[in-house]
């Protein structure tokens, strides 16, 4: 995984600190929360619209154990889902 993608994936405490800093700078932080198991055009559209509503887009990914979309889900484990989402240019942090 590229370093710039790794840098977007933060622990919860690190994410809270980033939000605090951005808010102090007067930036509007927006969040999208979901499974993000399969990145399809609807997800891209949703994230684009979310990014347009603020300065910083944070995406939080539901943990594998908490996914309730059926017995075969998630298709991809949470580490891969995090990597996929953080690879998107409109996402600032995961």
Please report, for each region that a protein language model flagged, where it lies by residue.
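Nucleotidyltransferase catalytic core that binds NTPs
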Residues: 1-94
